[in-house]
Amino acid sequence: APQERGPPEIPP
């Protein structure tokens, strides 16, 4: 089952 994920972490 697909997992609900948030936005990808973008390094500074």
From Swiss-Prot:
Keyword terms, alphabetized: Hypotensive agent, Secreted, Toxin
Subcellular location: Secreted
GO function terms (MF aspect): toxin activity
GO BP terms in the entry: regulation of blood pressure
Tissue: Expressed by the venom gland.
Disulfide partners: none
Signal sequence interval, chain numbering: none
Function: Bradykinin-potentiating peptide. Shows poor inhibition over ACE (Ki=1 mM). In vivo, potentiates bradykinin activity by increasing its edema-inducing activity in rat paw. May also potentiate the hypotensive effects of bradykinin.
Family to which the UniProt record says this protein belongs: Belongs to the bradykinin-potentiating peptide family.
Name of this protein: Bradykinin-potentiating peptide 10 g-AP
Organism of this sequence: Bitis rhinoceros
